[in-house]
């Protein structure tokens, strides 16, 4: 994944953290495991009357850190044109290599993951809430300016901007970071002429690559574990309804070893 990013950017490891990433973290969920039961779920939405409850979020993240059942945050990383909203434009074996569990020994990075998970599961985002999430993420980044924090901050700003555009909110972040192009195209086609939609969506927003048969590694081990997946049905979580995505999520969440870095130092 890092190699893909560096090739597309044309930069080396040293200055990569200073660049806008061509990849974004997606499908972020908390993973907890107890014996043979594994649960992947979105971070609870700590929002009251449109206000981000920072202290509650901090308490939740710290409780995860000290829980022996917490495995980490599962996430996948997409290059922008691979995320077609309704479908994923990559083959299962490629998606599998982009899917991992992240568990840094740093509450700042974990809280940024929590913000990402909350953000993609918001049913009714508002301008003030999106701004609060971005501001909190930026504050956290100032406390830990490592490559992973920079990458997560970029993901939060990008998804907040995309959410603002998609729901017609016009939050300030939209003028700072461009929304994801395929989501802009999706909204444009959906809001357009019905006849055109039937023609354009199959051309620009449909991929059958994920329907390719793929036998995930450690399949036998994952089948011995009960796996449950919980999330809110939003425009950012459509991929979690795909059977191949679910199969790979189960495999990774139940059998893989968490990693402490997304991008190497």
Swiss-Prot record:
Keyword Calcium attached: no
Keywords: Host cytoplasm, Host Golgi apparatus, Virion, Virion tegument
Pfam families to which the protein is assigned, alphabetical: Herpes_UL7
Record has Amino-acid biosynthesis as a keyword: no
Listed InterPro entries: Herpes_UL7 (IPR002600)
Record localization: Virion; Virion tegument; Host cytoplasm; Host Golgi apparatus
Endpoints of the signal sequence: none
Domain of life, source organism: Viruses
GO CC annotation, single: host cell Golgi apparatus
Family listed: Belongs to the herpesviridae cytoplasmic envelopment protein 1 family.
HAMAP family: HSV_CEP1 (MF_04038)
Role, per record: Plays a critical role in cytoplasmic virus egress. Participates in the final step of tegumentation and envelope acquisition within the host cytoplasm.
Record protein name field: Cytoplasmic envelopment protein 1
Gene that produces this protein: 42
């Amino acid at each position: 994944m890092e190699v893909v990013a560096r090739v597309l950017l044309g930069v080396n490891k040293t200055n990569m953290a200073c660049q806008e990433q061509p990849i974004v973290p997606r499908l972020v969920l908390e993973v907890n495991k107890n014996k043979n039961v594994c649960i992947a779920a979105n971070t609870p939405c700590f929002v009251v009357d449109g206000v981000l409850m920072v202290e509650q979020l901090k308490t939740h993240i710290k409780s995860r850190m000290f829980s022996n059942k917490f495995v980490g945050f599962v996430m996948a990383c997409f290059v922008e044109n691979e995320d077609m909203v309704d479908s994923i434009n990559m083959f299962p074996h490629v998606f599998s290599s982009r899917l991992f569990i992240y568990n840094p020994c740093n509450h700042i990075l974990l809280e940024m993951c929590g913000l990402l998970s909350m953000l993609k599961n918001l049913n009714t985002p508002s301008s003030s809430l999106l701004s609060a999430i971005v501001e909190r993420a930026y504050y956290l980044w100032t406390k830990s300016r490592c490559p992973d924090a920079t990458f997560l901050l970029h993901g939060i700003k990008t998804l907040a901007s995309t959410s603002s555009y998609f729901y017609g909110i016009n939050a300030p972040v939209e003028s700072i970071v461009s929304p994801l192009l395929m989501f802009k195209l999706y909204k444009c086609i959906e809001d357009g002429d019905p006849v055109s939609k039937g023609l354009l969506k199959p051309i620009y927003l449909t991929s059958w690559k994920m329907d390719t048969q793929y036998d995930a590694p450690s399949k036998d081990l994952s089948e011995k574990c009960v796996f449950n997946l919980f999330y809110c049905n939003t425009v950012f979580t459509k991929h979690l309804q795909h059977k191949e995505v679910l199969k790979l999520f189960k495999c990774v969440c139940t059998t893989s070893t968490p990693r402490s870095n997304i991008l190497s130092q």
